[in-house]
Amino acid sequence: MEVNKLIEELVEVIKDRKNDIIFSYLFEEESDKILKKIGEKSSEVIIACKNASKEEQVHEISDLIYNLMVLMMKQNIEIENVIEELGKRRNMTLNKKSTKSVYPSIH
């Protein structure tokens, strides 16, 4: 499936679930629940990447991306905003004469 189409469908799923009682606790105005969920999922990604199979890593990374998208929706951040920022960083990297990148280095 095309990535853009998949992201669009995922955004629609999140919008549809926003009013679901079980899911809506993540959207509570004064709640840190989504932030805690992202912390939990981030830890699970780290552990999976250290100890688990590729299948488990993909599963945990997918959970993290989903929860980040929920947070983005709660904060009124569109996926296009993130894509635009990534494009700016890419262009900045390409335009720099030095090899220093605006992306965090991977060690």
From Swiss-Prot:
It is found in: Cytoplasm. SUPFAM superfamilies: all-alpha NTP pyrophosphatases (SSF101386). It catalyses: 1-(5-phospho-beta-D-ribosyl)-ATP + H2O = 1-(5-phospho-beta-D-ribosyl)-5'-AMP + diphosphate + H(+). It is an enzyme of class 3 (hydrolase). GO terms for cellular component: cytoplasm. InterPro entries: HisE (IPR008179), PRib-ATP_PPHydrolase-like (IPR021130). Pathway: Amino-acid biosynthesis; L-histidine biosynthesis; L-histidine from 5-phospho-alpha-D-ribose 1-diphosphate: step 2/9. One of its GO terms (biological process) is L-histidine biosynthetic process. GO terms for molecular function: ATP binding; phosphoribosyl-ATP diphosphatase activity. Its EC number is 3.6.1.31. Belongs to the PRA-PH family. This is Phosphoribosyl-ATP pyrophosphatase. It comes from Clostridium tetani (strain Massachusetts / E88).
